[in-house]
């Protein structure tokens, strides 16, 4: 949605709000730009998505942050981590300097996650903890951004109960941060600017990347799948793909800067290119193009089984810098549960996809996500998830108890699965996850593997740590000069979720920048 469309739609949004007194935020505060609306967020229009490659910060805002510092606390997924890099880039362009000391920061931003209730509770606790800081230093600015900001209930709760917050902005208008900051400095009221409809694709946004070894590369925004449990299609908007030439240019620049690994990001990367009306171009085509660039490792996340094509499998099977690790969320192994989840595939079709992947990529490492305790999940249905895990032999899984999200269809479903039953099932599933992880890890004992050394181990500063191409954590002793390099490590010990090894040598570079 471009600027003109946003202004026009905001009239309709505000008119709708006038009909509903319980959502009239103005009775609490003087000035609100635009509050979120989940009903509006669900609509998927055919408005043209504009590509803005000329983003510039107005000169009048430059210097706003001189002699001021900022701190960003980030919760949630890789997309949020990427957004934080952009927010930090904008703040530094305004003159702010990053700090790790929350007690001295002049601007504190909390980049939030809405995927599970636990994440939201942590954010509200964090906001509450900042109340005393606001009393001690009333001139600081406290802001809430990210996916939680796109939820009406969250914004309403902040407006009513957390008056230490100065500004709220969403996922679609990060590029408006200079204007939002200026308004927050000038206004006595809380500033809220949350676009319920997605915005243009803004290129050339400044970024402050976390480190110089690995980088996030966003390839698309939003999700149109509307799984019944998921709030993301509401908080991130409809699917919008970046132009391939813009992505490829960014990857080439990262190669020139010496990055060793990139991860292509999207809520559903497999849908990449479907909305590009002037060309036929999908994720397989993009991976093929990037495979010719001198980035040693290329990952992508997150994949939806529905959109995983044979073309993609073929490209990954060619090897090169596309790693043989595929994260393929299954969520459940029972067809009835998958149907009410709105996952658009069956147990049988998922297993068929796994077979096609394994046939063409024999050395592939498959990992997954699983939700336990979906509304009315029976013991028999849960056991089908366990048997599917056995059939696939996943090397790892991220497992979760079902978390109700207001505004999703699943929130209206009656749930008769007691919490203690859900926890017991999760425990059984995690036991299986650990079992198969140990099997996968044990195969590495005695082998020499290539590891991207990322830094010191979290548990021992004298030990270095990094990951294999299949995302296995490896701990080993080596000179600190190896940080940021690809090295060969002989595996001496396989633990359940990590490997211990001995440094052999630095790997020789093979690729040439295209």
UniProtKB/Swiss-Prot annotation:
Any one GO molecular function term: N6-isopentenyladenosine methylthiotransferase activity
Domain Radical SAM core: 209-440
Broad class of the protein's primary localization: cytoplasm
Cofactor: [4Fe-4S] cluster
Record: residues binding [4Fe-4S] cluster 1: 77, 113, 147
UniProt subunit comment: Monomer.
Protein name (record): tRNA-2-methylthio-N(6)-dimethylallyladenosine synthase
Organism expressing this protein natively: Staphylococcus aureus (strain bovine RF122 / ET3-1)
């Amino acid at each position: 949605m471009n600027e003109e469309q946003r202004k026009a739609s905001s009239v309709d949004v505000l008119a709708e709000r006038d009909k509903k007194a319980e959502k009239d935020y103005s009775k609490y505060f003087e000035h609100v730009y635009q509050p979120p609306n989940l009903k509006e967020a669900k609509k998927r229009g055919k408005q043209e998505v504009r590509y803005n490659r000329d983003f510039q910060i107005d000169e009048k805002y430059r210097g706003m942050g001189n002699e001021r510092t900022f701190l960003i606390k980030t919760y949630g997924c890789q997309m949020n981590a990427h957004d934080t890099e952009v927010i930090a880039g904008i703040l530094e362009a305004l003159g702010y300097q990053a700090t790790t000391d929350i007690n001295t920061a002049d601007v504190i931003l909390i980049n939030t996650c809405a995927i599970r209730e636990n994440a939201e509770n942590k954010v509200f606790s964090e906001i509450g903890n900042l109340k005393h800081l606001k009393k001690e230093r009333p001139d600081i600015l406290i802001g809430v951004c990210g996916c939680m900001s796109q939820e009406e209930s969250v914004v309403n709760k902040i407006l009513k109960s957390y008056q230490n917050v100065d500004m709220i902005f969403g996922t679609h208008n990060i590029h408006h941060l200079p204007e939002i900051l200026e308004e927050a400095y000038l206004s006595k009221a809380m500033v809220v600017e949350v676009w319920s409809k997605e915005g243009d694709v803004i290129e050339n946004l400044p970024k402050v990347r976390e480190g110089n070894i690995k980088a996030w590369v966003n390839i698309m925004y939003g999700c149109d799948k509307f799984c019944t449990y998921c709030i993301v299609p509401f908080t991130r908007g409809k699917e919008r793909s970046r132009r391939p030439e813009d992505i490829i240019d960014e990857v080439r620049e990262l190669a020139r800067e010496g990055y060793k690994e990139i991860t292509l990001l999207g809520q559903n990367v497999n849908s990449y290119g479907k909305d590009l009306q002037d060309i036929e171009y999908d994720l397989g085509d993009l991976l093929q193009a990037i495979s010719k660039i001198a980035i040693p490792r290329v990952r992508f996340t997150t994949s939806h089984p529905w959109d995983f094509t044979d073309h993609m499998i073929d490209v990954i099977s060619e090897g090169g810098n596309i790693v043989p690790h595929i994260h393929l969320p299954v969520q459940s192994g029972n067809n009835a549960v998958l149907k009410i989840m709105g996952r658009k595939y069956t147990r049988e079709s998922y297993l068929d996809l796994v077979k096609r992947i394994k046939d063409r990529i024999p050395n592939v490492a498959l990992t997954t996500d699983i939700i336990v305790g979906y509304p009315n999940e029976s013991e028999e249905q849960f056991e089908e998830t366990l048997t599917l895990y056995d059939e696939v032999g996943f090397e790892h899984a991220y497992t979760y108890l079902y978390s109700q999200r207001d505004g999703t269809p699943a929130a209206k479903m009656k749930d008769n699965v007691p919490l203690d039953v859900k926890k017991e099932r999760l425990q059984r599933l995690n036991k299986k996850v650990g079992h198969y992880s140990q099997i996968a890890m044990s195969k590495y004992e005695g082998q020499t593997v290539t590891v991207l050394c990322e830094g010191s181990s979290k548990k021992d500063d004298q030990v270095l740590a990094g990951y294999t191409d299949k995302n296995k954590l490896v701990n080993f002793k080596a000179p600190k000069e190896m940080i940021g390099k690809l090295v060969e490590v002989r595996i001496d010990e396989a633990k359940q979720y990590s490997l211990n090894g001995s440094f052999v040598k630095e790997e020789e570079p093979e690729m040439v920048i295209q």
